[in-house]
């Protein structure tokens, strides 16, 4: 999911993904990571169709040279080492988007899954608050949240999720995303349930 795009949502839905990945952002953390996963083109196309029908600009891509990013590769390394799951990667880190676009995309994602006949797990990779520590210090604080304020708000968000208090969470989401440099990019329509 950590795939930055400048416009619209993009779905990478090749039949097969394989390569050796090194992060452009932090090559000293993630480097020379070999990967090979099966994809699910039908699901990817369905996601794009449902989202576009909901008014969210979305494109499905089956381009062999369109590689996976670490937001997909890192979770797959730990959860799909046996290639048990098919992979579809969604660019949900849009440089210019609204939270309502993200909400509608989440609802369309759910619709696309429900229209299929398989079992699907959705993994949202990223973080809650999302601000790296100051330059030259990432290793020193690699396992820490960069600011205590962000940590406290993140803990509150997790509590709201555990309680199923989607109404309160959705009400605070715009400020949370802004004030905590949020990487929470879309929500499903769980608040309607």
Regions found by a protein language model. Give the residues of each.
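Active-site beta-strand/loop microenvironment that shapes enzyme catalytic pockets
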Residues: 93, 97-147
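Gly/Ser/Thr-rich active-site loops/lids in small-molecule metabolic enzymes
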Residues: 139-164
């Amino acid at each position: 999911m950590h795939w930055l795009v400048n416009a619209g949502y993009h779905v990478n839905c090749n039949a097969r993904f394989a390569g050796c990945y090194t992060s452009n952002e932090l090559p000293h953390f993630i480097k020379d990571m070999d990967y090979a996963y099966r994809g699910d083109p039908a699901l990817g196309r369905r996601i794009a169709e449902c989202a576009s029908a909901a008014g969210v600009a979305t494109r499905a891509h089956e381009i062999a040279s369109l590689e996976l990013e670490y937001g997909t590769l890192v979770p797959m390394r730990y959860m799909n080492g046996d290639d048990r799951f098919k992979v579809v990667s969604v660019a949900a880190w849009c440089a210019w988007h609204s939270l309502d676009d993200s909400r509608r995309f989440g609802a369309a994602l759910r619709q696309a899954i429900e229209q299929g006949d398989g079992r699907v797990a959705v993994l949202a990779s990223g973080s809650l608050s999302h601000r790296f520590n100051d330059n030259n210090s990432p290793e020193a604080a690699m396992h820490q949240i960069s600011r205590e304020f962000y940590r406290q708000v993140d803990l509150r968000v997790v509590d709201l999720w555990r309680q199923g208090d989607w109404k309160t969470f959705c009400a605070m989401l715009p400020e949370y995303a802004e004030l905590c440099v949020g990487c929470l990019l879309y929500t499903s329509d769980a608040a309607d349930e």
